[in-house]
Regions:
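Active-site environment of divalent metal-dependent phosphoester hydrolases
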Residues: 13, 68-73, 95-98, 317-320, ...
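Active-site metal-binding motif and surrounding structural segment of the metallo-beta-lactamase
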Residues: 29, 42-91, 332-351, 363-366
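N-terminal helicase ATP-binding lobe
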Residues: 1-3, 13, 48, 53-57, ...
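A short acidic, amphipathic alpha-helical/loop segment
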Residues: 46-47, 75-79, 323-330, 353-360, ...
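Active-site-proximal segments of catalytic enzyme domains
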Residues: 321-324, 339
Length: 406
């Protein structure tokens, strides 16, 4: 029987999670979701060193970064040391005009390092990791355009010895100049899951991006606004001038001053065995807190086999009904009912949460990756109280979590 295991590493105010699927004697499938911290960089370095030793420096089959704040990506360069390969790297895709809107709503300036990502995400990665990413397949994930459930019925237009996935038509020509990377750029169908498996055993990797109209308080006439943004970008591109001042003026008129209306992009990842039918040992978990040289390791042995999925949320906002509804409709009733482990959004911030959110997900395990000593004081008490009956576990500078065989 295949096993799915995962870790949440002790990196303080940040997130670094890894996992593997083992099927018999075949090489394990490895994934990583986020890799960064706003606490001491030494924490992420130590965590990656332990991860490397644990996995014998294995290549990563699937890398998913929720978004590009420092506390979620500061360890990527360390992770890719020693020529480690990334086989598939999922990149959230929004059209250029939307990316620049998002960047300025996040108060990212053209002289900030992150600005280059919003201009061209693949070129941004290539600049830093050219050698390591020569063979990487970049999977560009657009936001869904409808409210239907993400399907596992594939017409695999692309597959390899690791993953099967369905592609869609190219949505933009903006990456065509990356000639050496172009064969490895794939446009994912956002309505379909990625599948990994051998024989009858299948695991699904469901990816979800928030639609642009839910990311911010967008203008009523979005089509007219889009046209204005594109005109500004095109005119400045032809003159090789900086469009930022003109864009800022337009954004201020459309969105107002400040960023109180923004909801940052955060790519979700849902993982589970879709062929597992085992139902035994109803209940929650066996939990052991084991002292280690560099802190404590919390080891969880799941007991409830009705639930066998992990849901990563990154720093997602689920603080209003439209955001929550779009996510739950995309996952569907069956997937929602199978969530064993939920990574609670944004380190347990009350600003990303609404009352009763815990009951909607009803996980067996609620993971908060945070440093309560930081100025934000995550996780917030209101969120902890909401998740109190769903086995909340705080992963911080001193405690990491290992989930055994979901």
């Amino acid at each position: 029987m295949p096993t799915l295991q995962c870790e949440f590493w002790n990196v303080g105010q940040g997130l670094f999670s890894s996992g593997r699927i083992q099927m018999g004697d075949a090489p394990a499938f490895h994934w990583v979701y986020d890799c960064g911290t706003n606490s001491s960089q030494k924490l992420i370095q130590n965590a990656i060193q332990e991860y490397n030793q644990q996995e014998n420096n294995a290549d990563i089959d699937l890398l998913v970064l929720s978004h590009f704040d420092r506390d979620h990506i500061s360890g990527i360069k360390e992770l890719l040391k020693n020529r480690r390969k990334i086989k598939h790297w999922v990149v959230p895709y929004y059209p250029l005009w939307q990316r620049l809107v998002i960047a300025l709503l996040l108060d990212i300036q053209p002289d900030d390092e992150e600005w280059a990502f919003y201009q061209n995400p693949i070129q941004y990665f290539k600049t830093y990791f050219a050698e390591e990413l020569k063979e990487t397949k970049f999977l560009l994930l657009p936001a869904k355009k409808n409210e239907s459930e993400i399907s596992i019925s594939l017409n695999p237009s692309s597959f390899d010895d690791v993953l099967s996935f369905e592609t869609t038509e190219k949505l933009s020509n903006e990456f065509d100049n990356l000639e050496q990377l172009e064969p490895n750029v794939h446009w994912l169908n956002p309505d379909k899951a990625l599948l990994f498996g051998k024989g009858e055993e299948q695991f699904e990797f469901v990816l979800y991006n928030v639609p642009f109209h839910l990311l911010a308080k967008v203008p009523t006439n979005l089509t007219a606004f889009q046209k204005q943004v594109k005109q500004i970008i095109q005119s400045h591109q032809s003159n090789s001038t900086d469009p930022t001042p003109a864009l800022k003026t337009l954004y201020t008129l459309a969105f107002g001053n400040g960023s109180k209306h923004k909801n940052i992009i955060s790519q979700y990842l849902y993982i589970r065995n879709i062929t597992s039918t085992a139902v035994w040992g109803l209940g929650n978990n066996y939990i052991y807190d084991i002292p280690k040289n560099d802190g404590n390791e919390i080891i969880v042995f799941p007991k409830d086999r009705n639930k066998n999925a992990i849901l990563y949320t990154g720093d997602a906002f689920l603080n209003d009904l439209p955001l929550l509804t779009d996510l739950t409709q995309s996952l569907g009733v069956e997937r929602m009912a199978r969530i064993y482990c939920l990574q609670v959004p944004h380190h347990g911030s009350k600003h990303n949460w609404q009352q009763g959110l815990a009951n909607i997900f009803s996980p067996c395990l609620s993971v908060f990756s945070a440093d309560s000593q930081r100025r934000n004081g995550h996780p917030h008490s209101e969120v902890l109280k909401d998740f109190a009956t769903y086995t909340p576990i705080l992963v911080n500078k001193n405690k990491r979590l290992f989930i055994h065989s979901i």
